[in-house]
Amino acid sequence: SVNKATAKLYPVANTPQAILALGVEGVKSYIKTIGLFNSKAENVIKTCRILLEQHGGEVPEDREALEALPGVGRKTANVVLNTAFGWPTIAVDTHIFRVCNRTHFAPGKNVEQVEEKLLKVVPAEFKVDCHHWLILHGRYTCIARKPRCGSCIIEDLCEFKEKVYS
């Protein structure tokens, strides 16, 4: 849903200045299909101000600076560092967490543990793309309820005890 919202927003406003010109209500009108859109719109406006005032209108290539932005945590910082700057980061979301624990590829009790294990086991040449593959696998095959184990290409490697074949 984020991609759909930004596909409508960016042709109209794709710079911090242009987004600020829309204001909170204007941003809301473009992102209302996203959960928590009210607080996210406010954070987007605050972030645009900070980008202009502290970073010359550019997104910083620095984890600490990214995580200091309103609404930006480790996962979002990892996504930005990976997709915008090509860093070998792995942003662990609910899909990746589920896939890694079900398959025992990189099990962990929390996203930080899963991320740490993934960074150790994923070969360097795959780190930039790995999180995209795992997200898609979790979103479309290894879904939360009734996973599609019968059509899973790694089913033979998976250690999930409650496999579903239908």
Language-model features: locations:
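Catalytic cores of DNA base-excision repair glycosylases
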Residues: 1-166
